[in-house]
């Protein structure tokens, strides 16, 4: 049994484009009992939430009481070439605008609590989460998994470097690189990365972590304390696929979101020894 229900939602952006999404809701969500919202951004970027995957499972978060928004912004597949072209080479523009537009539409619903929201994504979705962090403080927390951070550094180090050089010129990369906005970040972030990730090398996560602690608006204090968190898997790849590690992944995400969005503590996995 699913712990909730699934709805199709959509909005129309300023350029007249329709942005579709799925919204997974707990059964108890209502105008009398609005629920927190988790915006979950898919990877790819040439991808879609139309395909089911056990690894990126919204129902686990719905079971914890969140509504989970699964949007298909510009660059998503299944909506024609023009929809892809809207975001081609401009990752931080149309895709970001689409994500904010569909979020605006959903938080206007009476069954959603617009004061308790978070954003999350992996790979390209993590890139977008990083971009969101540097462009808005509307979310209480952001989770970024296996994410692109400094695009000038990423391009020549990924195992898909040949593809990347066809996707973006050096100038495009710098125009769309999240690391240039680190000084604007005032939202607590959970950074997750696997050391054996060759698609988005670990250097992206390490640099993001260092720059959050040194240059964001929530830097580490004299004792090294900061609301930002880093979950590191020394023997995992781009997805984090070992079942015990996938379990830890979800438990740490739940802990971080509960603290930052819901305002209470959930225990961390015993395996972390914390």
Please name every model-derived segment.
Residues 29-35, 40-80:
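Short substrate-entry loop that stabilizes the transition state in hydrolases
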Residues 7, 19, 37, 64-66, ...:
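Structural beta-strand/beta-sheet cores of well-ordered domains, especially the beta-sheet scaffolds
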Residues 70-274:
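Active-site-proximal cap/loop segments of hydrolase catalytic domains
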Residues 1-33, 56-58, 63-64, 105, ...:
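Non-catalytic accessory segments flanking enzyme active sites
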């Amino acid at each position: 049994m699913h712990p909730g229900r699934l709805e199709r939602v959509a909005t129309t952006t300023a350029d007249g484009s329709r942005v579709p999404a799925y919204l997974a809701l707990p059964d108890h969500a209502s105008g009398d009992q609005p629920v927190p919202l988790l915006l979950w951004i898919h990877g790819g970027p040439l991808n879609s939430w139309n395909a089911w995957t056990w690894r990126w499972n919204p129902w686990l978060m719905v079971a914890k009481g969140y509504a989970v928004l699964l949007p298909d912004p510009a660059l998503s597949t299944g909506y024609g070439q023009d929809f892809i072209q809207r975001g081609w080479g401009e990752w931080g523009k149309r895709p970001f605008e689409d994500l904010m537009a569909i979020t605006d539409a959903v938080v206007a619903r009476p069954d959603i609590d617009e004061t308790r929201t978070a954003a999350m994504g992996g790979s390209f979705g993590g890139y977008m989460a990083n971009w969101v962090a540097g462009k808005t403080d509307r979310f209480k927390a952001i989770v970024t998994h296996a994410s692109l951070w400094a695009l000038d550094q990423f391009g020549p180090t990924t195992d898909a470097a040949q593809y990347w050089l066809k996707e973006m010129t050096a100038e495009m990369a710098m125009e769309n690189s999240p690391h240039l906005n680190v000084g604007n970040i005032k939202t607590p972030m959970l950074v997750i990365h696997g050391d054996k990730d060759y698609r988005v090398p670990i250097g992206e996560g390490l640099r993001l972590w260092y720059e959050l602690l040194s240059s964001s608006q929530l830097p580490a204090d004299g004792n090294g304390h900061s609301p930002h968190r880093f979950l590191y898997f020394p023997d995992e790849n781009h997805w984090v696929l070992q079942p015990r590690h996938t379990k830890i992944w979800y438990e740490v995400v739940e802990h971080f979101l509960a603290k930052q969005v819901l305002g209470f503590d959930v225990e961390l996995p015993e395996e972390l020894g914390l």
